[in-house]
């Protein structure tokens, strides 16, 4: 499957909101001795004068450089002396695209030596078993080509202090560094997932020294971070590393996976562009030599130069830097993996207009046309765009899908036409795969609760009101940005953020979720697929979210 490079930036912007500044005071904190070494963190006085400790930039793997580039990660060496864990780590090398907005740029330097994690913990730091805190481990989104645990929006201090939990965020390798596949151990693909696995193993071994309970770990993520979270939940290699998951806008039923052979064939194009392969000397025919050559290529050449060599944005393709099935971490496809797992608790949800931001990056010129030139979106043009979208995914029943979404929309109903376009993109990529996994968890007897985020942030980077609550808009509320930066938000948004951080951390601690009025959050089941809205006005309980749309798509997914 060949994806336009502009589409990669869709999920790229996922989870990379940056709002600068800090509100907490910082002083050196205690030294914590672990099985990985001794680490000195910072003491933070957060909102409400709560004190927590932050340990930033802890290495969990050896630098994936030199001979270790493109290989599975190796555990970091034991640290001699005391490691000063007071600065967020560098970001992993990632895409430099003209489509990224300024606020989507990483707020730290990019380095290949980037496999670090950060953690925030309540100041008690008790290691007594009965006093250990529940743990939340976050996997950021970004299309597997962008993102960083150093971004301010992922600062875990508010979650930790408000919810009395330990919060962990991690970097993992991106783009070619995380997914190059030569069909050999020199570059086996899925390195990013193995990075995440190693970080979870580090947490399991060491989190008790920071006051966290290794037996009460919840893994959560957004967009491809949610994809990865649910993949890891189904992997045979993660047994005992975490107990439940939370998914924000995404699941393992997504269409953005590949088989190894196709991945290697497409990765050969990258090897050719950086001067390490040609028509007769390929990544598949000569993997050892080609990968050895690629280890000598400057990191920036992978993430910048070769994309620019491909010409226009429309011509840029995704070299299929996505997870693949068929190795130890993902032995087979999601539908088979899920049969083998004992599924426990799931809290999941989507945003009300997932497809708006995704459509903008899939067709960036369209957004500019409608916003800057005030043009009208017609059914004819929407049909062209939908057909282009379906070509990317090699979807054969495009006429049937277009009729389903546009057939009953009047020619002069621009709002309805726009809603249909956003629906196609959002339903296919995010909303329906998330619902399908919730269905499967419920079918297997797991405790499932579902939300729909409905608030368009006052800090939104999207001028048109019709963008709505777009992909990734909920993250700033989950991590408490309105609490940390009240001057940038309304009082209603601050209240919503406080409620959401409480909801997320309550799920982690007890799964006892409450609605705003104090009543019980509804359970999600196949017979009653109930959800609760997250918005600044009255909370609504709904059922069968996007039911007709997801029933339409269901036969096209391997569930």
Curated annotation (Swiss-Prot):
The active site is at residues 223, 354, 471. PROSITE patterns: CARBOXYLESTERASE_B_2 (PS00941). GO terms for molecular function: acetylcholinesterase activity. Expressed by the venom gland. GO terms for cellular component: extracellular space; plasma membrane. It is found in: Secreted. Glycans are attached at residues 278, 342, 374. Keywords: Disulfide bond, Glycoprotein, Hydrolase, Neurotransmitter degradation, Phosphoprotein, Secreted, Serine esterase, Signal. Its main location: secreted. Disulfide bonds join 92-114, 276-293, 432-550. The modification Phosphoserine is found at residue 223. It catalyses: acetylcholine + H2O = choline + acetate + H(+). Residues 1-21 form the signal peptide. Substrate binds at residues 142-143. GO terms for biological process: acetylcholine catabolic process; choline metabolic process. InterPro entries: AB_hydrolase_fold (IPR029058), AChE-related_enzymes (IPR050654), CarbesteraseB (IPR002018), Carboxylesterase_B_CS (IPR019819), Cholinesterase (IPR000997). Coiled coil: none annotated. Its EC number is 3.1.1.7. Gene3D superfamilies: alpha/beta hydrolase (3.40.50.1820). Terminates signal transduction at the neuromuscular junction by rapid hydrolysis of the acetylcholine released into the synaptic cleft. Belongs to the type-B carboxylesterase/lipase family. This is Acetylcholinesterase-1. It comes from Trittame loki.
């Amino acid at each position: 499957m060949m994806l336009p490079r502009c589409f990669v930036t869709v999920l790229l912007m996922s989870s990379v909101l940056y709002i600068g500044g800090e509100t907490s005071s910082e002083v050196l904190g205690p030294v914590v001795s672990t099985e990985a070494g001794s680490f000195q963190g910072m003491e933070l006085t957060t909102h409400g004068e709560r004190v927590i400790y932050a340990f930033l930039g802890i290495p969990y793997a050896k630098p994936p450089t030199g001979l270790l580039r493109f290989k599975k990660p190796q555990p970091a060496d034991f640290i001699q002396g005391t490691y000063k864990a007071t600065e967020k780590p560098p970001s992993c090398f990632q895409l430099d695209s003209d489509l990224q907005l300024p606020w989507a740029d990483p707020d730290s330097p990019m380095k290949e030596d980037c496999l670090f994690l950060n953690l925030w913990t309540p100041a008690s730091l008790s290691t007594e078993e009965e006093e250990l805190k529940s743990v939340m481990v976050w996997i950021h989104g970004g299309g597997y080509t962008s993102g960083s645990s150093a971004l301010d929006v992922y600062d875990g201090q508010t979650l930790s202090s408000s919810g009395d939990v330990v919060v962990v965020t991690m970097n993992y390798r991106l783009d070619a560094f995380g997914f190059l596949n030569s069909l050999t151990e020199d570059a086996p693909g899925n390195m990013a997932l193995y990075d995440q696995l190693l970080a979870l193993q580090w947490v399991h071994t060491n989190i008790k020294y920071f006051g966290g309970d290794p037996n009460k770990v919840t893994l959560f993520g957004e967009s491809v971070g949610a994809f990865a979270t649910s993949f890891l939940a189904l992997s045979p290699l993660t047994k005992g590393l975490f107990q439940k998951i939370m998914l924000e806008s995404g699941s393992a039923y997504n269409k953005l996976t590949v088989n190894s052979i196709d991945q290697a064939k497409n990765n050969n194009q990258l090897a050719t562009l950086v001067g390490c392969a040609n028509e007769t000397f390929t990544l598949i025919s000569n993997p050892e030599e080609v990968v050895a050559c690629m280890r000598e290529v400057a990191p920036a050449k992978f993430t910048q130069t070769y994309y620019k060599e491909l010409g226009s944005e429309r011509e840029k393709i995704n070299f299929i830097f996505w997870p693949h099935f068929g190795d130890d971490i993902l032995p087979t496809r999601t539908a088979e993996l899920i049969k083998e797992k004992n599924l426990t608790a799931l809290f999941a949800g989507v945003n009300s207009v997932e497809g708006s931001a995704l459509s903008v990056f899939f067709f960036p010129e369209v957004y500019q046309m409608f916003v800057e030139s005030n043009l009208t979106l017609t059914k004819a043009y929407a049909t062209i765009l939908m057909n282009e979208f379906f070509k990317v995914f090699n979807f054969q029943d495009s006429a049937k899908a277009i009729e389903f979404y546009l057939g009953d929309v009047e020619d002069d109903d621009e709002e309805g036409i726009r809603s249909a376009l956003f629906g196609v993109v959002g339903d296919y990529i995010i909303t329906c795969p998330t619902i399908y996994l919730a269905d499967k968890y419920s079918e297997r007897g797991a405790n499932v609760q579902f939300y729909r985020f409905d608030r368009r942030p006052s800090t939104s980077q999207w001028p048109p009101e019709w963008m709505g609550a777009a992909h990734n808009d909920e993250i700033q509320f989950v991590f408490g940005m309105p609490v940390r930066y009240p001057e940038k938000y309304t009082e209603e948004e601050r209240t919503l953020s406080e409620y959401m951080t409480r909801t997320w951390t309550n799920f982690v601690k007890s799964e006892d979720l409450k609605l705003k009025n104090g009543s019980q959050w509804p359970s999600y089941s196949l017979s009653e697929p109930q959800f609760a809205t997250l918005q600044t006005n009255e909370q609504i309980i709904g059922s069968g979210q996007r039911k007709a749309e997801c029933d339409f798509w269901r036969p096209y997914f391997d569930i």
